[in-house]
């Protein structure tokens, strides 16, 4: 598993413009990520998802996020997430470690 401290820096640099992680965080361009792990795609309450996200039907976990974050548009064709992805596996692992910690405490 990755380093949550490094993952926080990656989140701030690459994700925080569109996402929040706090329990009471608001949706931005992207959904609030609180409760992400164990939730199906397209299910954050109050966020308007594309049909592609709603119908993907996978459950977010370490493995699914590892694949998704490498190339979101390849993993969920039709997603409105405008993000090229993170090619370095160790950076994705760090980000996932941070998300796992910050979206459930």
Swiss-Prot record:
Organism of this sequence = Xenopus laevis
Q: According to its UniProt record, where is this protein located?
A: Mitochondrion intermembrane space
The free-text function statement in the UniProt record for this protein reads: Electron carrier protein. The oxidized form of the cytochrome c heme group can accept an electron from the heme group of the cytochrome c1 subunit of cytochrome reductase. Cytochrome c then transfers this electron to the cytochrome oxidase complex, the final protein carrier in the mitochondrial electron-transport chain.
Alphabetized GO MF terms: electron transfer activity; heme binding; metal ion binding
Tell me what gene encodes this.
cycs-b
**Modification after translation:** Binds 1 heme c group covalently per subunit.
**GO annotations of cellular component type:** mitochondrial intermembrane space
A biological process from GO? mitochondrial electron transport, cytochrome c to oxygen
List the keywords (alphabetical). Answer: Acetylation, Electron transport, Heme, Iron, Metal-binding, Mitochondrion, Respiratory chain, Transport
Which residues are recorded as binding heme c? Answer: 15, 18-19, 81
Residues annotated with N-acetylglycine modification: 2
Under the heading InterPro entries, the entry gives: Cyt_c-like_dom, Cyt_c-like_dom_sf, Cyt_c_1A/1B
Q: Family membership, please give it.
A: Belongs to the cytochrome c family.
* Entry keyword annotation includes Iron: yes
Heme in keyword set = yes
What name is this protein filed under? Cytochrome c, somatic B
């Amino acid at each position: 598993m990755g380093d949550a401290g490094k993952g926080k820096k990656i989140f701030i640099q690459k994700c925080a413009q569109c996402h929040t992680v706090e329990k009471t965080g608001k949706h931005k361009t992207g959904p609030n990520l609180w409760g992400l792990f164990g939730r199906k795609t397209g299910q954050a309450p109050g966020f308007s998802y594309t049909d592609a996200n709603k119908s993907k039907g996978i459950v977010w976990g370490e493995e699914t996020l590892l694949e998704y974050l490498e190339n979101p548009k390849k993993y969920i064709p039709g997603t409105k997430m405008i993000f090229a992805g993170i090619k370095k596996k160790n950076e994705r692992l760090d980000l996932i470690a941070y998300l796992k910690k910050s979206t459930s405490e």
